[in-house]
Amino acid sequence: MQTKPVQEAVVSVFDIERLARPLIEVCGYVETVLPDAPSEQFAAWHVPSECTRIEQRLLVPSPSEAFPADGRGALRLVRFHGVEQKVMRSSQRSWDTGGIFDVDVFSADLDRVYRALQRHGWTAMGEPVDYSEAMFSVRQVVAIGPDGFVLAIIQRYEPFVEGLDPTGLLSPVFNSTQVVSDFDAAVRFYGETLDFELQMTCKIEDVVEPGADVLGLPLPHARDARRELAIFKPQGASEGGIELVRNLDMHGKRWDAECIAPNVGILCLRFEVDDAAAYAAEIEGRGGVLYARPVTLEVAPLGIVTLFSVRSPEGAIIEFYSL
């Protein structure tokens, strides 16, 4: 099934304004206040019946020469009213598993952006740091905002990303990381059940980064901890979509059960496909289980869509829609 790059990451929050303001003022996002989500979205997200409304705001990255103004790679901030909530990945440790760990963006001036975010109360797993991994040479910081939101900001030296805003304004979301305990099951899910394309796989051993500052692993364990990594992209998409990481030597808590609505954190990723109903049937034909069956609903500002979702073996919700 032909799929476009990440359309948006849906982020559940306690307070929309608290997360939106620094993303707008520092990172260059443009906001659109949306109508509340319709009743069909409540059902698709398995929202408890006591929820009275789903408030929404869309944050779209500023266009650049590298990334035109097509609305992709956006952040949809949602607030569930009238229900009890907790943070999905509560302690934010990079060796905990379950759900969606972060979303990834490019910046031409990572340090400027991160230092400005710190003035809004943001922190990070560690300091911005240069490192090389596989064919990539980058500078990176994994920034931590409010409400369980983790944002990996990447300044890529090689291969260089041409046409980014020179002041550091963030690119669209192009990738998202999931920390898993069963690497083989996650690889089968994305590679076989969803038929995503495996872009690369590698093992990380006997290096400090990405570990000490990127993931907050304490020394000497940052060097000693063996990690497996795989990057998948949907068929037809020009950019990567899902990065899987397993830490073989450091083990934390599993947060799978908490990574659902109306809890707070990165709720799901959304991808546009040619034919959502047909893709759902393909997934079921390969033995996959749907989290939400295809439904027709209005998703502002996209319009009337057919949408369904799946849930990975460790609780990451992935939505697919077609216009």
Predicted segments, located by residue:
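Eukaryotic phosphotyrosine signaling hubs
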Residues: 6, 98-102, 174, 264-267
